[in-house]
Amino acid sequence: MIVTTKSGRNSERMAINVRLENSFTMPTRITPVANGVDYMTNYNEARVARGFSEYYSEDKIKNTRLGTDRYIYPDVNWYDLLFKDFSTSQNANINLRGGGKKVEYFLNFSAHNEFGMLRKTSHSNYFTGDNMQKYTFQSNVSAYATKTTRVSLKMTTQLMNKYGTSGVASDLFNYTMTVNPVDFPAVYPSRADLDHVPFGNAPSWDGSGTQTNPYALLNQGYCNRFWGNVLATVTIDQDLAAITEGLRISGLASFANYTYSSVWNKLTPHFYTLTNYWMTPEGDYEYDLSTIGTPGNNFLEGGRSNSGNRIMNFQAKIDYARKFGKHDVSAALIYMQKEKRLNVPSASQSDILPFREQGLAGRVTSGFDSRYMAEF
């Protein structure tokens, strides 16, 4: 498929256009979730209504309401902890357009920088938010080699880089809407005897495992993904009226290359759960922690993936169109061929071999008095 983009124009002066934009993005609506006190109160009422005893004690509800200690009586707003209120994006575009009687040109460069809604945290040495950068380079040049020969070259390059947490943003959002706000804090204070971040956690409801800590998933690692598209097209159009009126030939050759690569690094967070707490004579709380769940590690384990393909197209066309009195006659003959190869083929036979396609098509039409037509 050939896409027609802007071209140059015959102008004595070069036209330069520059556009800069900055925009703000925010959710239209976020479903409100209950705070810790309302959650525990409603949960107890639901249990009592079904003939069960209350699950959360009045002491826990009271101290959570008073904010006595955020590690012993947590009340976590997971959404506010992981997501920002708004994000920003920037766009820049510059293009040059001009030419003369024999050469026309159009040059364009655009850049786009966009930040997502995820927050950058202070508990990791890498960027935990999400950022996308996109660049587009475009060059269209058309020249008349002779009075009857026109040559055009169109080149477009698109580059895009996405960087962010190894977690999936949609999954993190779902967790912020469903994870219990009072069972554990997002993270406990660091201690001198620890060489890692002590993320909070607690046993699951059925005791078979642990719960999900969205904040730990946000800090679990990062992923860097890159996409690249390059397209170059050369066209030649030759008017052969010197041989016979209405005859012309044209040719097209194009090359397209697509690449994708991703690199990710992840670690297993260290999870801790509260096992005991007490109040000191000075009126301060102290507590004991123990590890829970899968043992964590302090190093990032990486992986990568690559893919891509390249496509070459060739097309030749002969056109003839002429009018003899009330008769209109036209004919066309088109030949095309296409070859596609994978940049990173697998061991399978279908991936190693290129995909090739050839085609030949023709058409002849005849019309009379703009009312009758035949086509073959």
PLM regions with names:
Residues 18, 248-256, 330-336:
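Extended hydrophobic secondary-structure segments that form protein cores and membrane-embedded regions
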Residues 74-97, 184-194, 199, 267, ...:
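Outer-membrane beta-barrel transmembrane domain signature of Gram-negative proteins
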Residues 33-39, 123-128, 168-177, 265-276, ...:
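Flexible, surface-exposed loop regions and adjacent strand-edge segments
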Residues 145, 235, 246-250, 254-256, ...:
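Transmembrane beta-barrel domains of bacterial outer-membrane proteins
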Residues 2-229, 235-241:
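Membrane-proximal, glycine/serine-rich, low-complexity loop/turn segments characteristic
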Residues 174-176, 185, 252-261, 309-311:
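Outer-membrane beta-barrel proteins and related beta-barrel translocases across Gram-negative bacteria
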Residues 25, 114-116, 160-162, 258-260, ...:
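Sequence/structural signature of outer-membrane beta-barrel proteins
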Residues 102-105, 148-151, 242-247, 326-329, ...:
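Repeated loop/turn-to-beta-strand initiation elements of outer-membrane beta-barrel proteins
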